[in-house]
């Protein structure tokens, strides 16, 4: 909301789809988040509920995390390439009632394990391709849920405002699961204080401002992406750019020309190798 007031018509998010960059301003992003938050309330989402998110980096999935937070729920991002058993463990461990799935691949993985998930109530899917003939008894399309939320603003607007006002600095902000290389993944709980202070201090250290351009390509379930693509973006007001796919990432990187770019050593090694091959 602060960024919408201060930066209004400035680009907040971009996504490349079918080779074309789509963009949303801060004002548009706030409306998207609010519509989904109201939609979640219409589904009966309660304070403290866990809302899982599975898929590649997309503005809509970042907004899903913000929508969950705005109603007092806890977002739980899941690694995009997680297999069914891994997803089942996370959803069961955190007692997730809702999950936002990016596409048919993610929906299929969840439907395969749904019988073992007693608490899962609704699967909210983003990309409808391939899902038209599915049984929709527990499926809900993302944009349709937003439309329902917009229609319920008169009835649920006060409840949303009440939940937002009731949040504190030490409330849970997000739950991130470890990779599980040494055993079962562990849920790491970060408070609003954890995320805000880390984002503030790291942004000040790197002298980041609202004019930065960042490419969001690292796993959404990783604490690094959460800090860079969520925390710092909200703190500074810079623009988060989501590539079309892993295959187009380098092309998308050149087109955006990020002013702030984070990568683990392996990514830089691969980039250096590609350059050396072409020389």
Say what each PLM segment does:
Residues 8-11, 124-125, 143-177, 184, ...:
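Conserved pre-ATP/AMP-binding loop-to-beta segment of ANL
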Residues 50, 56-76, 80-84, 92-98, ...:
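A short helix-loop-beta submotif of the ANL/AMP-binding
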Residues 56, 99-111, 128-129, 258-279:
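Adenylate-forming
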Residues 51, 68, 99, 172, ...:
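Conserved S/T- and glycine-rich ATP-binding loop of Class I adenylate-forming
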Residues 43, 70-148:
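Structural core segment of the AMP-binding/adenylate-forming
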Residues 9-58, 62-66, 83-88, 138-146, ...:
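Conserved AMP-binding/adenylate-forming core of the ANL superfamily
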Residues 196-213, 220-279:
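Conserved AMP-binding/adenylation subdomain of ANL enzymes
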Residues 23-27, 165, 173-199:
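Conserved AMP-binding A3 loop
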